[in-house]
Amino acid sequence: WIFDSPDQAGEAFRQFIKQCYQANGFVNGGVTIGDREVHLGMIEMPVLNIFAEQDHLVPPDASKALRGLVGKTDYTELSFRGGHIGIYVSGRAQKEVPQTIHDWLDQR
């Protein structure tokens, strides 16, 4: 599945890597969409941050950092047992994650 993505235009890919990864533009500023600069502090809607407790690709501490970066006070973190893929495909996740998302949305 890693290799199932479409080809990317070289310059667009370079710009994405430079702005999003190297410069951390959504945190530090510098990302422009259309004619508007955007960053995480501009988020004005409720945020539900779901992450896997045993994720080896996106460690929980990397996910938890979002709390201090978004501009919204309605912020919820939910962690689930599992790894990077297991949080989406395991039987337990299939029972727990969708219901949790439903409940969170229903409260808003």
Residue ranges and their predicted role:
Residues M45, P59-L69:
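Short alpha-helix in the alpha/beta-hydrolase fold that links the catalytic acid
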Residues W1-H39, M45:
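Alpha/beta-hydrolase
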